Amino acid sequence: MDDAYFLKQALSEAQKAFDADEVPIGAVIIMENRIIGRGHNQVETLTDPTAHAEIIALTSAFNFLGAKYLPEATIYVTVEPCAMCCGALYWSKIGKLVYGAADPKHGGLSRVALHPKTEILGNIYANDCIDLMQSFFRKKR
């Protein structure tokens, strides 16, 4: 299993958000090639502006491991994380971030936004991630 496989898993989570009429962003967290946390946007469902895919996936991984730091873990997210989610990733000490599509408008990614040891890899399946987002917003308009 590789980055492409796990980003496809994150896209599957994003589809769940799309189906629930949420902004279609999904995330999975892995350790040792095993998914330990997953999430998709649930902002509208939970009436909670912090219920982003990354936050839900992080909480799931923390609960699974019984730990608050994830230096050996990788998060796969369909869209570049926002500033809030980058902050959560920073405090989790996540080992690696892999994202699908950049988000120039709302993305909060910068080298200082994440833990200095966090590896970053972007633009994996970017077109698939963008297509899902565009489909969602076309449906809304």
Describe the residue ranges of each PLM region:
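Zinc-dependent deaminase
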Residues: M1-D19, P81-R141
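Small-residue (primarily alanine) positions within well-ordered alpha-helices
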Residues: A10, A14-A17, A27, A53, ...
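Short beta-strand scaffold segments in enzyme catalytic cores
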Residues: I25-N33
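A cytosolic small-molecule/anion-sensing beta-strand core signal
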Residues: M31-E32, T59, P71
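Short beta->alpha transition motifs characteristic of CBS
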Residues: I36-V43, E119
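Glycine/small-residue-rich phosphate/adenosyl-binding loop
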Residues: G37, E54-N63
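A short, polar/charged loop-to-alpha-helix boundary motif
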Residues: T45-I55
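Immediate flanking context of iron-sulfur cluster ligation sites
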Residues: A67-E80
